[in-house]
Amino acid sequence: MRAALALEDGTIVHGELFGSPREAEGEVVFNTSHTGFQEALTDPSYRGQILIMTFPMQGNYGILPEVGESDRVQVEGFVVRYLHDGPIHPRAEITLDEFLQDHGVPGIAGVDTRMLTRKIRTEGAMRGVLVPYEPDDQPSDEELLERVREVPHISEMDLVPQVSVREEYRFSDGKPEIVVIDCGVKRSILRELAKRGAGVTVVPYDTSAQEIMDIDPDGVVVSNGPGDPKRVRETVETVRELIGQVPLMGICLGNQILGLAEGGDTFKLKFGHRGANQPVKDLDKDRVYITSQNHGFALDPDSLRDTPLRVRWVNVNDGTVEGVVHTDAPAFSVQFHPEAGPGPWDTKWVFDEFLAMCREH
């Protein structure tokens, strides 16, 4: 089968379908990582999005059993230049094509991903549809663009409830006792906490502050997740109540939630930061780290001036806020992903810093 990808600016490309023969819609974004397609596909922060990989070949090592960041493919659709159909890693269980088929997610191959990336970089992330079709039944351009016009904007989607756990569960035993508010948490975050001896309990995004304090945690992590942080009012209110009661760390969406909880504001980035090569400067240490990132929203630095939040990390490329520290309470947050998954391990020490804070308090 064939497939078409249509963007809201009128761009339409045709290619070969792989994965599931169903239609997909969402915000079309790009990731600049050279490897890590499995981690990207299973990252809950990609819910509601059609993902373009800028590196040309994808699928060349197959799907490995221990690598996924969640139990399912989270992207709505997958766009690649070349789909590898040859030998895969000896430990791989299935191919990328089979993986997407199993999870009901369509992909399109054989398209100019460089052109698409340049367009999104210039014009910004935009709505799109991925439509499979038989070669003798190609949809018209107007039909495709009409479908695009019906796609909701990412800020109109309630995505966190779709990816958050529905019931509290225990991930690991140990000390200090950490509660993770699941807004779409990646497994790598839980693994990094457990690796350092922490006891980890995961709770739904809408768990109240009182319910969390009843667990008697030594610290709370507000996880990554998809979409606009202003759509998760319950989590913002919970964090507002927890500040000062227990040490807090936010990651990615959790960074934005901490900012909103203290009266800051967020805004949508033009095309977001998605990849494993984002340089971030730590103003406290006067050092630059290469980080893994996946977000389309950011904290407005001007909105933080009258709040108890101090900017500690900034993006070297565009100057956006990459993390804040609370000046009156044991709390901080980072916009980047210290756990990587995929990406560099330069900032895994952030977990050590947080757990030390939990032990001190």
From Swiss-Prot:
It holds the Pfam family CPSase_sm_chain. Gene3D superfamilies: 3.40.50.880, Carbamoyl-phosphate synthase small subunit, N-terminal domain. GO terms for biological process: 'de novo' pyrimidine nucleobase biosynthetic process; 'de novo' UMP biosynthetic process; glutamine metabolic process; L-arginine biosynthetic process. InterPro entries: Anth_synth/Amidotransfase (IPR050472), CarbamoylP_synth_ssu (IPR006274), CarbamoylP_synth_ssu_N (IPR002474), CarbP_synth_ssu_N_sf (IPR036480), Class_I_gatase-like (IPR029062), CPSase_GATase1 (IPR035686), GATASE (IPR017926). Residues 1-173 are annotated as: CPSase. Keywords: Amino-acid biosynthesis, Arginine biosynthesis, ATP-binding, Glutamine amidotransferase, Ligase, Nucleotide-binding, Pyrimidine biosynthesis. Its EC number is 6.3.5.5. Belongs to the CarA family. HAMAP family: CPSase_S_chain. This is Carbamoyl phosphate synthase small chain. It comes from Methanopyrus kandleri (strain AV19 / DSM 6324 / JCM 9639 / NBRC 100938). The gene is carA.
